[in-house]
């Protein structure tokens, strides 16, 4: 909430806050390959990401009006799991967890991860990677903002629309 609260203070009344970042359903294929290679007894090797519901709750907690969080999944095909991991490292998305595995990851383990990834998620001559992109929008409160109408003030019966 700290960054959101700072953003709120920086905005003018009725100012728009807009942010994009990875959501909780990012890289399920890579997570599964790591878990299977370690026989399901692994420390997390991929940083956790926030889910849609929690992102919306953070916007509300920071005091934003009209908060909305949208989710979009993008699928990218990489030449191999190693190309995907290089892409993640170049993007600066390495595991930031404090309780992550501290020892060296052996070559055989990483080869097994790549093998499992290719077996389970091959597509178009490469491997599929799914990224969930969350878009957060919220407005700094202002008296000019649209307000919800009173309950029961609608002119059309909802059952007529259906």
Task: Kindly give the residue locations of the regions a language model identified.
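Generic hydrophobic/packing signal
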Residues: 3-6, 20, 42, 87, ...
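Conserved catalytic/acceptor-binding region of the Class I
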Residues: 14-83, 91-103
């Amino acid at each position: 909430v700290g960054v959101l609260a700072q953003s709120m203070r920086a905005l003018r009344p009725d100012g728009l806050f807009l942010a994009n970042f990875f959501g909780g359903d990012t890289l399920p294929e890579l997570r599964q390959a790591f878990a299977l290679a370690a026989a399901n007894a692994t420390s997390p090797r991929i940083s956790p990401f926030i889910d849609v519901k929690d992102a919306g709750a953070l916007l509300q907690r920071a005091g934003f009006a009209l908060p909305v969080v949208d989710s979009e999944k993008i699928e990218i095909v990489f030449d191999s799991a190693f190309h995907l991991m290089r892409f993640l490292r170049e993007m600066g998305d390495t595991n930031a967890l404090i309780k992550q595995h501290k020892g060296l990851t052996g070559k055989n383990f990483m080869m097994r991860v790549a093998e499992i990834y290719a077996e389970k998620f091959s597509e178009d001559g490469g491997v599929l990677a799914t990224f969930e992109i969350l878009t957060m929008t919220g407005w700094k409160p202002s008296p000019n903002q649209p307000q919800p109408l009173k309950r029961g003030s609608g002119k059309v019966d909802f059952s007529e629309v259906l």
